[in-house]
């Protein structure tokens, strides 16, 4: 799904309004700002269930007093084969979100009891096949086969982990980019990966950011201080990190057919995994 296709879906849904909607992000979802609303258009119909669950999560967090994005419509729509959800637009951010902002929201989320509906386990590796399928012939078949084999190996290892923290609700993609600092304080956004699983999933993300994406050591230390624990001291950290690296690498593949920079970054990531080099920096594209 490219931007033009996503805009066609907006038009079909009657949400393009008078002013052209502003594209905020384009990945598995196209995210648009349309007046005082934010509209998320999913890549394919198979993501409808996830969109519906994200709305249920938002309502649950509102009831629990967690500062998180709020839905403007209670149900997801399916428009021309694409799931679509509508959200209240947040005020402009007063500053970039920091590690401490994320840690505080995670502490609140991780303290909650289970919601009154079933959350899935964090299927960290579940998107690998879909992303590689979307990549098609743009990526080397040997690289795709390598990632599939790596996925299968890590799936078994993750299933056998013994957690340090009590399992429960997690965000699933816990990064500062998924926190919006509004005038009233930090707000958790992008709730589609909220799951019920090892709390360590949410903490390994920042550890990987330190090692792969250039997060300064001081920023990572601020995160662990604010949360109260450093996941790197846990025996299972390397396994969760390896699984997330596999997923993060495959995620880039879906963008390779239309984006030469994404293809170059995909190749870079695969090479670093093949070489077993944990210090090669990964980049946005």
Role assignments for model-derived ranges:
Residues 28, 33-36, 79-83, 243:
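A short, glycine/Asx- and small/polar-enriched loop/turn
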Residues 130, 134-138, 142, 250-285:
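ATP/Mg2+ or Mg2+-diphosphate-binding catalytic cores
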Residues 25-39, 71, 155-203:
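Active-site acidic catalytic loop and adjacent metal/ATP-binding pocket
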Residues 1-69, 183, 283:
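Conserved NTP-binding catalytic cores of kinases and kinase-like/nucleotidyltransferase enzymes
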Residues 84-92:
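Short pocket-lining segment of the protein kinase catalytic domain that shapes the ATP-binding cleft
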